[in-house]
């Protein structure tokens, strides 16, 4: 093989392994999927499939006290019932604790993280944002949280739907927790390490997760890893302003009749499904969605009030 052919082969490998779209849906097993969950799942699925990309599923079982027995399996069965088939195997955060701890240990040993014993009450008294009290106090590991040194704050990021998102300086500068005092690993650390492990290229999720995005970008830079792009979908809220959520007892979507809920979710996401689509097979409904998907049609809002919950 000549030098040109070898270079071309290397280029092809690079293009197929490093630039291929990989998206994901990462629910927490705190209850069944509801209409708000379906919006996030469908939006991330259509964004991936419309680019012939991979769509992965990760179960974020990071907080056992909030989890409901059997919810993870129920979520997966619901995705299957809705035709939202994923690529590869499902990742479970409960099986990734070793990776999280290894990274924390590396940062602790390198001086990039430290133990903190400040209480929520103390932080509230200090103004609501952590002022770095324990950064140079060499606290013991016992009864301590672990915080990351934030020496280069992320003051803004660009969202693919909402444009530039500015982050308040007090929030951007805060040394944030990467392992809680009770020993549980923080969401921001886990989600970034998992997205890197799964080669995620873009995160499509609900707008309720806009705020922690700056911290997640900061973790990518701390890890010297290229950050993903972000697209935050509008949230479905009730007329009193509450987000549809498991905590607010949003009803589970119907596994036995997926097409009406899928069409409603497509409409919520700015698509215009034809009236005849309700009569089509599930696979044809999803294929219509893949063909019609365009992020330019997404409502540029962080919340949309539903007149009816699903």
Curated annotation (Swiss-Prot):
<dbReference type="GO" id="GO:0006400">
    <property type="term" value="P:tRNA modification"/>
</dbReference>
<dbReference type="InterPro" id="IPR000924">
    <property type="entry name" value="Glu/Gln-tRNA-synth"/>
</dbReference>
<dbReference type="Pfam" id="PF00749">
    <property type="entry name" value="tRNA-synt_1c"/>
</dbReference>
<dbReference type="GO" id="GO:0006424">
    <property type="term" value="P:glutamyl-tRNA aminoacylation"/>
</dbReference>
<keyword id="KW-0479">Metal-binding</keyword>
<dbReference type="GO" id="GO:0005524">
    <property type="term" value="F:ATP binding"/>
</dbReference>
<feature type="binding site">
    <location>
        <begin position="24"/>
        <end position="28"/>
    </location>
    <ligand>
        <name>L-glutamate</name>
    </ligand>
</feature>
<dbReference type="GO" id="GO:0008270">
    <property type="term" value="F:zinc ion binding"/>
</dbReference>
<feature type="binding site">
    <location>
        <position position="187"/>
    </location>
    <ligand>
        <name>L-glutamate</name>
    </ligand>
</feature>
<dbReference type="GO" id="GO:0004818">
    <property type="term" value="F:glutamate-tRNA ligase activity"/>
</dbReference>
<feature type="binding site">
    <location>
        <position position="130"/>
    </location>
    <ligand>
        <name>Zn(2+)</name>
    </ligand>
</feature>
<feature type="binding site">
    <location>
        <position position="246"/>
    </location>
    <ligand>
        <name>ATP</name>
    </ligand>
</feature>
<keyword id="KW-0862">Zinc</keyword>
<protein>
    <recommendedName>
        <fullName>Glutamyl-Q tRNA(Asp) synthetase</fullName>
        <ecNumber>6.1.1.-</ecNumber>
    </recommendedName>
</protein>
<dbReference type="InterPro" id="IPR049940">
    <property type="entry name" value="GluQ/Sye"/>
</dbReference>
<dbReference type="InterPro" id="IPR014729">
    <property type="entry name" value="Rossmann-like_a/b/a_fold"/>
</dbReference>
<keyword id="KW-0547">Nucleotide-binding</keyword>
<dbReference type="GO" id="GO:0005829">
    <property type="term" value="C:cytosol"/>
</dbReference>
<dbReference type="InterPro" id="IPR022380">
    <property type="entry name" value="Glu-Q_tRNA(Asp)_Synthase"/>
</dbReference>
<feature type="short sequence motif" description="'HIGH' region">
    <location>
        <begin position="27"/>
        <end position="37"/>
    </location>
</feature>
<feature type="binding site">
    <location>
        <position position="118"/>
    </location>
    <ligand>
        <name>Zn(2+)</name>
    </ligand>
</feature>
<feature type="binding site">
    <location>
        <position position="134"/>
    </location>
    <ligand>
        <name>Zn(2+)</name>
    </ligand>
</feature>
<feature type="short sequence motif" description="'KMSKS' region">
    <location>
        <begin position="243"/>
        <end position="247"/>
    </location>
</feature>
<comment type="similarity">
    <text>Belongs to the class-I aminoacyl-tRNA synthetase family. GluQ subfamily.</text>
</comment>
<feature type="binding site">
    <location>
        <position position="60"/>
    </location>
    <ligand>
        <name>L-glutamate</name>
    </ligand>
</feature>
<feature type="binding site">
    <location>
        <position position="205"/>
    </location>
    <ligand>
        <name>L-glutamate</name>
    </ligand>
</feature>
<keyword id="KW-0067">ATP-binding</keyword>
<keyword id="KW-0436">Ligase</keyword>
<dbReference type="InterPro" id="IPR020058">
    <property type="entry name" value="Glu/Gln-tRNA-synth_Ib_cat-dom"/>
</dbReference>
<feature type="binding site">
    <location>
        <position position="116"/>
    </location>
    <ligand>
        <name>Zn(2+)</name>
    </ligand>
</feature>
<keyword id="KW-0030">Aminoacyl-tRNA synthetase</keyword>
<comment type="function">
    <text>Catalyzes the tRNA-independent activation of glutamate in presence of ATP and the subsequent transfer of glutamate onto a tRNA(Asp). Glutamate is transferred on the 2-amino-5-(4,5-dihydroxy-2-cyclopenten-1-yl) moiety of the queuosine in the wobble position of the QUC anticodon.</text>
</comment>
